Amino acid sequence: LKLLKESLIQKLSKKIDYKNIEKIKYLKWCYDKLLLNDNNTKTSILKPGSICWVDFGQNVGSELRKLRPAILWRSSADKKMWTVIPLSSKCYNDKYYFHCDINGLPCSTAKLESMANFSYKRLREPFFHNKKIAHLSEDDYSNILVSLKKYYTFEN
């Protein structure tokens, strides 16, 4: 294990261009993933429809990245895996059928095309709105469900 560690450090020292910010961010994300494995978020308080801060990490190309709020859509039975729908303020009111505006939060859009499954360890803490844990309204839930059906059945 010690040799593996030394070899990895040596390779990184030679191969990384420390002037390339994207490569530095990626290395930081690798380190952050180690820390995430120690995260023991209390999953008992999490439920579908809640909005939570989720660490999407430093991904490749135009994949979604960084810490951002996301809707907890559904979980595995033991709540160790969650399907999440990230939220964005940049897509609000843009009329794409795979973006669903959330009426219960100011300038928030559910990015259905970036729906993903993650370990509960990526869930940081609840997202608050008006001093309360944010949760989808029944109308927002229904609107997302309709949009998801369109997105996954190619009915636009």
At which residue positions do the language-model features occur?
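C-terminal terminal-subdomain/extension
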Residues: 1-30, 96, 100-156
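Polybasic/polar functional segments that serve as interface/processing modules
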Residues: 34-37
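Short, surface-exposed secondary-structure edge patches
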Residues: 40-45
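Loop/turn positions that initiate beta-strands
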Residues: 48-51
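Short, charged beta-turn/beta-strand-edge "cap" motif at the junction between a beta-strand
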Residues: 57-61
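Compact nucleic-acid interaction/catalytic patches
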Residues: 62-104
